[in-house]
A protein has these predicted regions:
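Amphipathic alpha-helical assembly/interaction segments
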Residues: 1-138
Length: 138
């Protein structure tokens, strides 16, 4: 794994820890519990799916897991925005998490797009380098 991937692994993990800390500070009422569960799943999913992508056994698996991590980051931003706009939860932690969630979402989305493009490029190059199929002669 390279340095960039290692740093992103750490950022996704730190984001997940931030989400845990945020959820622990929520008031103990039904609405906050339900919203907190959704945020917790999505926030942990960013790290879990990115880490899984890094262990991918194939380009296809890497791209799929990276796409899921991107979706989880997007969902985390949704829940954090809902907390911010409704005035639920610790405001300062929510704002910093929202900023980090937006950054992670952008990084993961761009990485996902680049990985898909690179895979398509490899496929095209592989097709071009194959010798033409011989037609049977009768």
């Amino acid at each position: 794994m390279n340095d960039i991937a290692d740093r992103l692994r750490q950022r996704t993990f730190d984001f997940a820890l931030g989400v845990i800390g945020f959820c622990r500070q929520l008031p103990d009422s039904w609405v906050e519990r339900e919203l907190g569960k959704q945020l917790l799943r999505a926030g942990m999913g960013v790290a879990g799916n990115y880490w899984s992508a890094c262990r991918g056994r194939s380009d296809k698996e890497f791209i799929a897991k990276l796409g899921v991590a991107t979706d989880e980051a997007d969902e985390s931003v949704l829940w954090l925005t809902a907390f911010e706009r409704s005035g639920i939860g610790p405001a300062t932690d929510g704002k910093s998490l929202l900023g980090e969630g937006n950054e992670l979402r952008a990084i993961l989305a761009k990485s996902h797009k680049t990985a898909r493009e690179n895979r398509q490029k490899k496929k095209r190059e592989a097709r071009r380098s194959r010798p033409p199929a011989h037609s049977p002669t009768l």
